[in-house]
């Protein structure tokens, strides 16, 4: 028997085909809910993303802030998967909880550790908004603790929770340590306008060569955002807040990256 399912599977990409993103992020979520119902699972926890708020919103956003489909396929499919889950709740099919993580980093993080290190090593990494976009890191262990609390707390049913750091840091402050790990100077920061032009060219070249370019215009826009997220609801309802400092989380991540051979480039 299974009492709670935590649905973490998703394609996290700004470059994959729309059809693949829809199949995995949306249709598979519906299929998973159907399977959960068949086996009388009580609660379904959907791991969504802060991208649900869109890229154009500014300032501190709580769970009551409207969502906005103003991004690429990742934004659209994460929003659509939330709709699937909330519809199941509204139809009394299953008890649901939605968690919207911030920029989750740590050992194994492809978008925020592995991919940037690979791009920096190849001298293919630049920051838009002159490195002043907002980054809302959450160390993976803190996120896992929060998800566990959301999965088990009796009052969490039907609720949505932001889980990120308190406040924000600039993208420059986040990515600078990765340059240091590789013994390089950086990051290189340019205007968003220039970054969009460069990323558009890179995406066209990727299309021509049949490769994926995660440094797409959608990623540029994402790294230029000026919003951060209130975590007061998770603090008050779940008794959760981040415990791992950024410095500690990055030190653990550095050791992991070294052990994986990611810094020998």
List each model region and its residues.
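Conserved Rossmann-fold NAD(P)-dependent oxidoreductase catalytic core, especially the SDR/UDP-sugar
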Residues: 27, 31-73
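Mid/C-terminal beta-alpha module of Rossmann-like enzyme folds, strongest
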Residues: 149-215, 247, 251-254, 262-265
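Catalytic helix-loop patch of NAD(P)-dependent Rossmann-fold dehydrogenases
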Residues: 23, 55-104, 125
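NAD(P)-dependent short-chain dehydrogenase/reductase
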Residues: 88-135, 140-141, 178
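Amphipathic terminal alpha-helices
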Residues: 229-237, 241, 245-265
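Glycine/proline-rich active-site loop of Rossmann-fold NAD(P)-dependent oxidoreductases
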Residues: 79, 92-94, 105-115, 141, ...
């Amino acid at each position: 028997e299974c009492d709670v399912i935590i649905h973490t599977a998703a394609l996290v990409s700004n470059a994959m085909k729309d059809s693949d993103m829809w199949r995995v992020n949306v249709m598979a979520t519906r299929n998973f809910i159907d399977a959960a119902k068949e086996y009388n699972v009580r609660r379904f926890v959907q791991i969504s993303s802060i991208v649900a708020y869109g890229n154009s919103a500014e300032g501190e956003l709580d769970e009551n802030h409207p969502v906005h489909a103003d991004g690429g396929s990742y934004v659209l499919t994460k929003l659509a998967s939330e709709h699937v889950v909330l519809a199941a709740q509204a139809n009394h099919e299953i008890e649901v909880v939605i968690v919207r993580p911030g920029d989750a980093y740590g050992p194994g993080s492809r978008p925020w550790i592995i991919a940037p290190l690979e791009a920096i090593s190849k001298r293919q990494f630049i920051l838009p908004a002159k490195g002043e976009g907002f980054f809302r890191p959450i160390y993976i262990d803190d996120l896992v603790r929060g998800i566990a609390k959301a999965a088990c707390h009796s009052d969490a049913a039907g609720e949505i929770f932001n889980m990120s750091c308190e406040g924000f840091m600039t993208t420059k402050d986040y990515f600078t340590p990765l340059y240091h790990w590789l013994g390089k100077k950086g990051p290189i920061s340019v205007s968003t306008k220039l970054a969009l032009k460069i990323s558009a060219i890179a995406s066209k070249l990727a299309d021509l060569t049949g490769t994926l370019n995660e440094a797409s215009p959608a990623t540029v826009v994402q790294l230029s955002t000026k919003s951060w997220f209130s975590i007061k609801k998770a603090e008050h309802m779940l008794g959760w807040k981040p415990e791992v400092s950024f410095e500690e989380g990055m030190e653990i991540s550095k050791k992991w990256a070294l052990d994986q051979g990611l810094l020998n480039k």
